[in-house]
Structures are given as structure tokens and as C-alpha cells.
């Protein structure tokens, strides 16, 4: 799950042409932590910081029951983003 979230963060950041350093500076988070977050290897970023990163990039966190595959609608929404 963290790898998927990180991949989405990296995609959104690159689309907006923001460097890891610029994103980190804007949010008070180190470039190293942003890199770890994008790779899915961050140890403990905290939910509040994660949400700040997501909101800054125009993303939101969604949940679904564990083990349930995504619906066609969810997959379609994913492609649109």
C-alpha cells in the first residue's frame, strides 16, 4: 500500500514539475523523507504529514475493505486521474 501511495505522490509531483526538495521545503519535510515516501520506504511520517503532502499535490486518500479488488468504477476513476 505504501509503495502505491508513494508512486501516486511521485506522479503528481512530477506532473506539477515540483522537485522533492521544493515539495519538502513547502511543507517543512526533508527531501530525504519525501524520497522515502515516494519509494514506500518511509519509516514513520505520520498521518497528518501524509495528508498535507497529498493535499498539496491535489490528491486524497481513499480506503476500501482489505482483500477486495477494486470495482470497475474505481479503476475508471484511477485512469482519469
Predicted regions and their residues:
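Short basic helix-loop element that most often maps to the first helix and adjoining turn
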Residues: 8-22
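Short, charged recognition helix plus adjacent turn
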Residues: 62-81
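DNA major-groove recognition helix of helix-turn-helix/homeodomain DNA-binding modules
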Residues: 47-62
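A detector for short, charged/polar N-terminal pre-domain segments
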Residues: 1-4
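Short polybasic/polar patches that bind polyanions
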Residues: 14, 25, 55
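Short, solvent-exposed alpha-helical "recognition" segments
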Residues: 41-46
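Short alpha-helical DNA-recognition segment
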Residues: 19-35
Amino acid at each position: 500500500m505504501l509503495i502505491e501511495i508513494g508512486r501516486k505522490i511521485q506522479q503528481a509531483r512530477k506532473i506539477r514539475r515540483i522537485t522533492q526538495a521544493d515539495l519538502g521545503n513547502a511543507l517543512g519535510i526533508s527531501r530525504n523523507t519525501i524520497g522515502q515516501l515516494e519509494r514506500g520506504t518511509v519509516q514513520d511520517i505520520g498521518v497528518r504529514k501524509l495528508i498535507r503532502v497529498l493535499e498539496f499535490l491535489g490528491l486524497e486518500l481513499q480506503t476500501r475493505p482489505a482483500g477486495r479488488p477494486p470495482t470497475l468504477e474505481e479503476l475508471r476513476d484511477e485512469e482519469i486521474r
